[in-house]
Structure formats: C-alpha cells, structure tokens
Amino acid sequence: LSAQQTIPYLSMHPDGVCKLPGGLYTKTVEYEDINYSVASTEDQTAIFSGWSSFLNYFDSSLPFQLSFINRRSHSRSRYQVNIPKADDNYNSVRDEFTGMLKNQIAKSNNGIERSKYITFGIPAEGIAEARPRLERVEADVMGNFKRLGVPSEPMDGRARLALLHSQMHPGSREAFRFSWKDIPQTGLGTKDFIAPDSLDFRQSRTFRIGQYWGAVSYLQIMASELSDKLLAEILELDAEMTVTMHIQTVDQLKAIKTIKGKISDIGKMKVEEQRKAVRSGYDPDILPPDLITFSKDAAELLADLQSRNERMFLLTFTVVNLAPTRQRLENDVFTVGGIAQKYNCALRRLDWQQEQGF
C-alpha cells in the first residue's frame, strides 16, 4: 500500500470540489475566531443562539465536519511584520522594534498557528450535479457566518491541497509547489504533490509520518452536558494536533420516533421495578436514581425536538496528535486526556485503527 493510497479522496478540482468514495462531493470554508469567551453574558447568549441556528441549517442529507488545526509555524509566518527603512539615523530603532514585534507574536501563540475549517458534503451522481448544489450550500454557510460576525473564506482546490500538504509534512520547511498545469505536463496526480515520504501504521496505538510520530484518539462523552470550554482548552495547548468533529444530523421524524421508543422502554423498566418493589414489600414509588435521571433527560430531549425546533446530531470527536518524538507525543496525548477527564469525558486511543482515524 502506497502513501498515496492512504489518502482517501478520489479527485480534487480547481474550484475546491473534492470527490470521495461513495459518490460524496465536498467543499471547505475557512473561518476565523469570534470573541466568545470575553463577551458579556448577553452577547454570549446571542452568539450561542446564532451558532445553534447555524448548526440547525444542516439537515440529514448534508453531513459536515468542523476541523481545528494547530500546526507549528516556521520562518514563513502568516503574520508579516515589515517596517520599511528610511534615509535617516533611526533604522537601528526600526530593526529593534520589528524584532520585538516578531518576538511578541511568537510568544503570544507559542509558535502555533491555529486554523478552523468547516467541510460539508452531498451525495451526487457526478460533478455536474454536485457543483451547483455545493455552491448554494457554500453561499448559505458563508451568509450564516456573516450574520455571526465571523470572517470566512471559501477554499479552492489548490488551497485545500496546500492544507493537506502541511498536514502530511509536519515539521517540514518545504514549500508547497503545485500548479494545475503540472498535472498534464508531469503525468502525476494531485496526491503525488502532497503525499509524505512515508507512512507507517504497523503499530497498534501510534503511527509514523515522515520523521514524526502520531496518534489518533476519540472522545468518549459521558457528561450529560458538554462544556463549551472543553474544545477551547484543548486548542490552547502548545502542541501540534488536529481536532475534528464529524457531525451527521438525524432526520427529525426518526429522532422523535427514537426518543419516544426510549421513553416507552424506560416506562416498561419503571413498571418492572415497581412490581419488584411490591413483591419485596418496598414502596413502589421509590425508583433507582438512574432510572429517574434517564426518564427526565429523555422527556427534555423530546421537548427540545418537538417544541423548540432543535435537532439531534450524531457526533464523532477525534484528536490527531503529532510530535517529533514518541515521548513528546505520549505527553501531549496525556495532557489532552487530562482536559477531557476534567469535563467528565474520556480520551480513548483507536487501537489498530490509526490509519482509518488519520
């Protein structure tokens, strides 16, 4: 199996449409941060409401994923500081001030560049059918971001390939050199321009990509409510990683039917517990605490779906850690696991599924 075969897409088009196995076509939009944590309570409520409406836009036929990428920046910083020199006696001061600004920028993010993306996909028979539908979704997504006050930018094919190249070459200072004219001239495919020198998935809990070590984990959510601080704390770490939230909306009728079925099952369990209590001479109104909690949570969820126009989502939360040494990798994974544990979640390694997770 070659490194190119590990990269799962089938084709990338110049306009940013990517074809995946199973007839799924995707596009990606890069977006920036919004000052949520430092906003007032009223503003936080408004932002949260807007974000909820944004997520509710996606129906069951439109899977999407949120990607948060922390990568180590090198000499080519995305923040360019340049104070032009003048014909006077103050150029040494300008040089000193420029150096100070560059140092402050490096310290503020610990040399880590943090990027955020949303990728959405639709099933289609071909690119001609997929392209106009994806363009409509892209316009809606960017319109929703604009209403939230979040700057966003669609990614074309070269930008998506450059992003994949940076993911496939951690720690490398090599620039991404690619032009669509290179394809017919060289006979190479787009994967040949982004594939790493080597990928090694022979170990069960780690993998090698070039000279770097990597590990893929997933988040086991055991909390009844997931704190908005969990993701923020993970992304603030001084570590190279990719956090991905794969989200699939459940059809509304199916979701309501599923919850009603669960409530019916809980009702049967209540009756059975009450029968046991009567036979044993206990008060039948005293039920196990877990059963009471499950019943209350299910009723609240059904109310959200039926009367508050909320949606049910299936979520897969994965974390890909990358590090130059195995010890640093294990330390980074341990730190992420500690943050997850603080919010009543567990970080589980994908044993023998590192390639699929990556």
Located regions from the model:
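Extended, folded cores of ATP/NTP-driven motor/assembly subunits in large transport
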Residues: 1-358
